UniProtKB/Swiss-Prot annotation:
PROSITE patterns: 3HCDH (PS00067)
Name of the protein in its database record: Fatty acid oxidation complex subunit alpha
Pathway of action: Lipid metabolism; fatty acid beta-oxidation
Keyword Membrane on entry: no
Pfam families to which the protein is assigned, alphabetical: 3HCDH, 3HCDH_N, ECH_1
Database matches in CDD domains: crotonase-like
Annotated keywords: Cytoplasm, Fatty acid metabolism, Isomerase, Lipid degradation, Lipid metabolism, Lyase, Multifunctional enzyme, NAD, Oxidoreductase
Species lineage: Bacteria, Pseudomonadati, Pseudomonadota, Gammaproteobacteria, Enterobacterales
UniProt source species: Salmonella gallinarum (strain 287/91 / NCTC 13346)
Function field: Catalyzes the formation of a hydroxyacyl-CoA by addition of water on enoyl-CoA. Also exhibits 3-hydroxyacyl-CoA epimerase and 3-hydroxyacyl-CoA dehydrogenase activities.
Spans annotated as Enoyl-CoA hydratase: 1-190
Family to which this protein belongs: In the N-terminal section; belongs to the enoyl-CoA hydratase/isomerase family. In the central section; belongs to the 3-hydroxyacyl-CoA dehydrogenase family.
GO biological process entries: fatty acid beta-oxidation
A GO CC annotation given for this chain: cytoplasm
């Protein structure tokens, strides 16, 4: 083997072959088509060595086994036949591993995903570490694909059909103990003894196939299987609304393998993989994947980041508590919280305790790890412990004089290099920095709620913010596990600016008599995770509508909402889920009562609630305003690129990923079609639908947001 080989064979003195996986020059192992020849050469040596007792596949990387196949291979395929051939080649290689005459063990530490898990499934036994980094799964569905190297056939036979369907249809990743319970791995051991434990397992005679639990055996029978697949199809259709063809094909392929045998199953798998690879949904989902990967690598500016060893947070409320958790528990940085009273500090500490305790209860971390992470967070009602903080995040009320006061206090009580980052959602960063002694160290860092779940943050420099401040803030966001996009300091920034007209239109249609559930269902069918009215309930009606006057003052009438309707709802003390009173009915602890709309809402706003528009018309009226505003943001350089605009919308508001984001969707529709549709809607519903200048210019020049050089390939 050459020194650049990703697979290296070493035969130990006890006649166990260890195949180390180490893709040269890469942080993580991914499978590439060109590795097939290397693996086959090793398999040939193994078959020819009659003295071998067993084989162990193990990664030489510090924290991953195999993170999956290289997705770029799919983009190089010109048609479905080429993609199908790629899948068949993978299937053949896995079959050769499975056919080895001696026990073959996969020794897994770190991520074992996609093609990595398919390789592990082809081994005769699997053993993994109890490390928090160890996860096993088949996430191909998230790219609009299915496992193409035998995963749809081997997994159901190993863990049972219902468990396999759940894993493959959702892309769910199992931790070590979950994998052991499911029968996906045979043992869980400390990382220090992984290799030796795998070697000992390899020396044993090949054991009989694990017996499936009674429930799985019943579901594997003809009657149980028929019932299961009928229920799974129904549930999946409700969830995907028909927008993700991969899910239906996954069900078909697994059912084919169980009903007609694995040979037919492998054939169906390869064929489905090839066809799915060519779908616009898969192409869009892969584009989102590559774009998010690029954004995570983007340093934000050309300047090197400044020191980032500890962080301060002003305000221990919902946002402050969430920011403290991601900073300490995700980023590993010491955090000092300041609040005006001890209750605020205790709230923030309890926020982190509750999240960590849930992880302990689910056995994701141990109690000592919880205590270690919690020890990173401390608090005070004054600025003691703030003098050495490298960056301070402000998460207080949306009040400009208060935030300006916070800037002055931080400049007085912290180091000369300390960055002040405001979590404002609506106030201009330039105004917050107006009286600052060091305005170059003031920046916006806009988190979305709930902080621990929402992946996006907006980094907002104002005109005087230094390049180093931008780079340091972007670095912090990445340490917090966030995907940061740098946006301009204009009213609403990017995400809230494109979201506001979308929600405004939903409220206007409500005043026209459309029913709440009809509006929400139409946008869910379009592809959003929740409808606009439900979203307003989730974020808080008071919070969600607070930015509307700011946007209307900045951009004019197109951002106006039916003020009397919003006032009526707020005056009736309806804030949404958080106080159990909103557009929907809520039971105990703010839980929605089976998606039932509160009928009193119609009387409150003075309408009957009789839907007249089709779902397509409802979706078009909401989405077109969002797209038009996104194009304006592109024109005004609120966002730096179409890439950032797509990621911001997908990660920030749940824009349908299978459409690739607003800019890829507009490119797919074509600028001419966009302009024609907006002009038609403007004639029907008024000038707020008038196409922006950017779209008109692009239609005239036949341009696109994503240039021809920008494909769905990773760089």
């Amino acid at each position: 083997m050459t020194t650049t080989s990703a697979f290296m064979l070493n035969v130990r003195l006890d006649n166990v072959a260890v195949v180390a996986i180490d893709v040269p020059g890469e942080k993580v192992n991914t499978l590439k088509a060109e590795f097939a020849a290397q693996v086959r050469a090793i398999l040939k040596q193994i078959r020819e060595n009659k003295a071998l007792q067993g084989v162990v596949f193990i990664s030489a990387k510090a924290d991953n086994f195999i993170a999956g196949a290289d997705i770029n291979m799919i983009g190089h395929c010109q048609n479905a036949q080429e993609a199908e051939t790629l899948a068949r080649q993978g299937q053949q290689l896995m079959a050769e591993i499975q056919a080895l005459p001696v026990p073959v063990i996969a020794a897994i530490h770190g991520a074992c995903l996609g093609g990595g898990l398919e390789m592990a499934l082809a081994c005769h036994r699997r053993i993994c570490t109890d490390d928090v980094k160890t996860v096993l799964g088949l996430p191909e569905v998230q790219l609009g694909l299915l496992p193409g190297s035998g995963g749809t056939q081997r997994l159901p036979r190993l863990v049972g059909v219902s468990t396999a369907l759940d894993m493959i249809l959702t892309g769910k990743q199992l931790r070590a103990r979950q994998a052991l319970k499911a029968g996906l791995v045979d043992d869980v051991v400390p990382q220090t003894i992984l290799l030796e434990a795998a070697v000992e397992l390899a020396k044993k005679e090949r054991l009989a196939q694990r017996t499936l639990p009674v429930r799985e055996r019943i579901l594997a029978g003809p009657l149980g299987r028929a019932l299961l697949f009928r229920l799974v199809r129904k549930k999946t259709a409700q969830k995907t609304q028909g927008n993700y063809p991969a899910t239906e094909r996954i069900i078909d392929v697994i059912e084919t393998g169980l009903a007609q045998g694995s040979s037919s199953g492998y054939d169906a798998e390869a064929r489905a993989f090839g066809e799915l690879a060519m779908t616009p949904q898969s192409q869009a989902l892969r584009a989102v994947f590559f774009a998010s990967t690029e954004v995570k690598k983007d340093p934000g500016s050309d300047a090197p980041p400044g020191p980032l060893n500890s962080v301060g947070i002003l305000g221990g409320g919902l946002m402050g508590g969430g920011i403290a958790w991601v900073t300490a528990c995700k980023g590993g940085l010491p955090v000092r919280i300041k609040d005006i009273n001890t209750q605020g500090i205790n709230h923030a500490l309890k926020y982190s305790w509750d999240l960590l305790e849930t992880k302990v209860r689910r056995r994701h971390i141990k109690a000592n790890e919880r205590d270690k992470q919690l020890a990173l967070i401390s608090g005070s009602t004054d600025y003691r412990g703030f003098s050495h903080r490298d960056l301070v995040i402000e998460a207080v009320f949306e009040d400009l004089p208060l935030k300006q006061q916070m800037v002055a206090e931080v400049e007085q009580n912290c180091a000369a290099h300390t960055i002040f980052a405001s979590n404002t959602s609506s106030l201009p960063i330039g105004d917050i920095a107006a009286n600052a002694a060091r305005p170059e160290q003031v920046i916006g860092l806009h988190f979305f709620s709930p902080v621990e779940k929402m992946p996006l943050v907006e980094v907002i420099p104002h005109a005087s913010t230094s390049a180093q401040t931008i780079a340091t803030t972007v670095k912090l966001a990445k340490k917090q596990g966030k995907t940061p996009i740098v946006v301009s300091d204009k009213a609403g920034f990017y995400v809230n600016r494109i979201l506001a007209p979308y929600i405004n239109k939903a409220i206007r249609m409500l005043t026209e008599g459309e029913r709440v559930e009809h509006i929400d269902a139409a946008l869910v069918k379009f592809g959003f995770p929740v409808g606009p009215i439900q979203l307003l309930d989730e974020v808080g009606i008071d919070t969600g509508t607070k930015i509307i006057p700011v946007l209307e003052a900045a951009y004019g009438e197109r951002f106006s909402a039916p003020a009397n309707v919003v006032a009526s709802i707020l005056n009736d003390d309806r804030k949404g889920r958080k106080n159990g009173r909103g557009f929907y009915l809520y039971g105990e602890k703010g839980r929605k009562s089976k998606k039932q709309v509160d009928p009193a809402i119609y009387k409150l706003i003075g309408v009957q609630g009789q839907s007249r528009l089709s779902a397509q018309q409802v979706a078009e009226r909401c989405v077109m305003l969002m797209l038009n505003e996104a194009a304006r943001c592109f024109d005004e350089k609120v966002i730096r690129s179409a890439r950032d605009g797509d990621i911001g919308a997908v990660f920030g508001i749940g824009f349908p990923p299978f459409l690739g984001g607003p800019f890829r969707y507009m490119d797919a529709l074509g600028p001419g079609e966009m302009v024609a549709t907006l002009q038609r809607l403007a004639a029907l519903y008024g000038p707020r639908y008038a196409p922006c200048e950017q779209l008109v210019r692009m239609a005239e020049r036949r341009e696109h947001f994503w240039t021809n050089g920008e494909t769905d390939q990773g760089n």
